[in-house]
Swiss-Prot record:
GO molecular function: AMPylase activity; ATP binding; magnesium ion binding
Keyword Electron transport included in the entry's annotation: no
Protein name: Protein nucleotidyltransferase YdiU
Enzyme Commission numbers on file: 2.7.7.-, 2.7.7.108
Record lineage: Bacteria, Pseudomonadati, Pseudomonadota, Gammaproteobacteria, Enterobacterales
Family: Belongs to the SELO family.
Cofactor field: Mg(2+); Mn(2+)
UniProt entry keywords in alphabetical sequence: ATP-binding, Magnesium, Manganese, Metal-binding, Nucleotide-binding, Nucleotidyltransferase, Transferase
Biological role stated in the UniProt entry: Nucleotidyltransferase involved in the post-translational modification of proteins. It can catalyze the addition of adenosine monophosphate (AMP) or uridine monophosphate (UMP) to a protein, resulting in modifications known as AMPylation and UMPylation.
Residues binding Mg(2+), per UniProt: 249, 258
């Protein structure tokens, strides 16, 4: 089957990009590709059979219909206007036309210098490329909206970060790479007509049902706010910390994008800071909902030339509504509740207080809770708490709450185990795969990808265990 590509961004949004070709790496080689995603997208297996070089995966060749461009965007970093930020190392190769008429961006990260590279070198390193591939696929199989990873190319090109590393490329796929920062770029350049063109592009291709509706811009922004709210709710319930929620890392479609200093909670710590460069804790775990709203407010500001402020403020309310509604639904599912009762939040917050005080493992606590039997006061979770009297008191109230619903244990446990993962991408697991890959051994990278495809399956190996102490102390930075 022949793949078809279009170039809607290039054709419809002039002055938002620079056309250029990727810059290949030295001795590039394909080390991993996403076989399941490739099958879903009808990508011929022959494209991955590259024995001499890395082909399209390393930017050495293009497929028919591809018209590569580097997109320009700006944004706020750590709450401060930073001006033009990129795309300094990513190139949109083209947009694949799918059978249902939709499209999918093929975006090559680490593709070389662009006019927007600022002081950067246009490269990505193997370490960060592996992390992003693992994280995006882990999030997908957890059911959280995200960009996807299609392939990784390694090389012998030296790249200087904190230490000397080697260059790599990631083929990232997404329905769109449109970010809040695209709108900010033209708003601060005092080009409101281009901001409106971006909004028109988004509506035309992703919300076509509103194209001819007079209030289309308000409806569109309401949906952006709601999608962002639902996304943040998903992050908070699964214990995901993004680490660098700058406005240029926020997706118009409500996707998780730009995996840098991310982390999943090990010990439950609501103030967890995954990014060691975040000295003020702006992007700490429990501040993510507030930061997302702040970012939406920055996006709303760019829309003031063609949306009234009152309408924008009403639309922003959709964020909080979506966040709280979706978070409440998800947490009730995690606790095994089928109905909403007035004291549910009290019970949840009491559990969080216990977990924070004891340093309980976030994912394992909820997974173990999913094995609760209403009539049994014993629980394997009890042995993980030092203050067993406090746990027993909470557990009695929890079982009493379960008995208020006419749901048997088997059905409830089944629901809980569909939303409480046994496996998440802990930083130490990613680091183990990286360490092996940097020595030329890709087996752990491939196997970890397989493990992450079944996050809700119980395991008795270390992929589902608490991290070793050294694994809790790994520092992650924006360096990638």
């Amino acid at each position: 089957m022949t793949l078809s590509f279009t170039a809607r961004w290039r054709d419809e949004l002039p002055a938002t990009y620079t056309a250029l070709l990727p810059t290949p790496l030295k001795n590039a080689r394909l080390i991993w590709y996403n076989d399941k995603l490739a099958q879903q997208l009808a990508i011929p297996a022959s494209l991955f059979d590259v024995t001499n070089g890395a082909g399209v995966w390393g930017g050495e060749t293009l497929l028919p219909g591809m018209s590569p461009v580097a997109q320009v965007c700006s944004g706020h970093q750590f709450g401060v206007w930073a001006g033009q930020l990129g795309d300094g190392r990513g190139i949109l190769l083209g947009e694949q036309l799918l059978a249902d008429g939709s499209t999918l961006d093929w975006h090559l990260k680490g593709a070389g210098l662009t006019p927007y590279s600022r002081m950067g070198d246009g490269r990505a390193v193997l370490r960060s490329t592996i992390r992003e591939s693992l994280a995006s696929e882990a999030m997908h199989y957890l059911g959280i909206p995200t960009t996807r990873a299609l392939s990784i190319v390694a090389s012998d090109t030296p790249v200087q970060r904190e230490t000397q590393e080697t260059g790599a490329m990631l083929m990232r796929l997404a329905q769109s790479h449109m970010r809040f920062g695209h709108f900010e770029h033209f708003y601060y350049r005092r080009e409101p007509e281009k901001v409106q063109q971006l909004a028109d592009f988004a509506i035309r291709h992703y919300w076509p049902q509103w194209q001819d509706v007079p209030e289309k811009y308000v409806l569109w922004f309401e949906e952006v706010a709601a999608r962002t709210g639902r996304l943040i709710a998903e992050w908070q319930t699964v214990g995901f910390s993004h680490g660098v929620m700058n406005t240029d890392n926020m997706s118009i479609l409500g996707l998780t994008i730009d995996y840098g200093p991310f982390g999943f909670l090990d010990d439950y710590d609501p103030g967890f800071i995954g990014n060691h460069s975040d000295h003020q804790g702006r992007y700490r775990f429990d501040n993510q909902p507030s930061v997302a709203l702040w970012n939406l407010q920055r996006l709303a500001q760019t829309l003031t030339p063609f949306i009234e402020i009152d309408a924008l403020n009403r639309a922003l309310d959709r964020y909080q509504d979506a966040l709280l509604t979706h978070y409440g639904q998800r947490m009730r599912q995690k606790l095994g509740f089928f109905t909403e009762q007035k004291d549910d939040n009290v019970l949840l917050n009491e559990l969080f207080s216990l977990m924070a005080r004891e340093g309980s493992d976030y994912s394992r606590t909820f997974r173990m809770l999913s094995h609760t039997e209403q009539q049994s006061a014993s629980s394997p979770l009890r042995d993980t708490f030092i203050d067993r009297a406090a746990f027993d008191a909470w557990f009695d109230r929890y079982r009493a709450r379960l008995r208020t619903e006419a749901v048997d244990d088997a059905l409830r446990q089944q629901q809980m185990q569909r939303v409480n993962p046994a496996v998440v991408l802990r930083n130490w697991l990613a680091q183990r795969a990286i360490d092996a890959a940097e020595q030329g051994d890709m087996a752990e990278l491939h196997w970890l990808h397989e493990v992450l495809r079944q996050p809700f399956t119980d395991r008795d190996d270390d992929y589902a265990s608490r991290p070793p102490e050294w694994g809790k102390r790994l520092e992650v930075s924006c360096s990638s």
